[in-house]
């Protein structure tokens, strides 16, 4: 199992002007960390986790039922997945829907006024990622 990425490294990766890259890559880091939690906490082989039949919904069900993930962290993961799906499956995603999803994201801590169109998204990805990494280290 590789060492988790630092928050600073993820922040640098998310510093892109390409919306599709931002939303797909941001979610990839979240889901990859979820995969590693499942491997470590439940001894699920990576071969099984990598199967297309092992969907994010199934992964989230396992983590939710076990009590590992709940509340705003769960909500953020679900919203990040919805945003990712819009960009992965539509040539021109509905910008208003994306804005609404981002508005629903939780900072998972205090936050000062954000600047930039997707600043809140970036902060929420990094903080959700950070919470998941802490879960992985327990």
Regions found by a protein language model. Name each.
Residues 1-138:
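Amphipathic alpha-helical interface elements
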């Amino acid at each position: 199992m590789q060492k988790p990425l630092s928050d600073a490294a993820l922040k640098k990766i998310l510093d892109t002007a390409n919306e599709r890259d931002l939303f797909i890559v941001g979610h990839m880091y979240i889901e990859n960390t979820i995969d590693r939690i499942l491997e470590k906490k439940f001894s699920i082989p990576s071969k099984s986790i990598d199967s297309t039949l092992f969907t994010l919904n199934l992964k989230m069900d396992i983590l939710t039922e076990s009590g590992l993930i709940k509340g705003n962290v769960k909500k953020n993961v679900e919203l990040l997945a919805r945003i990712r799906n819009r960009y992965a499956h539509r040539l021109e995603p509905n910008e208003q829907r994306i804005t609404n999803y981002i508005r629903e994201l939780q900072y998972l801590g205090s936050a000062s006024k954000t600047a930039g169109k997707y600043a809140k998204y970036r902060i929420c990805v990094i903080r959700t990622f950070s919470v998941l990494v802490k879960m992985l280290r327990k």
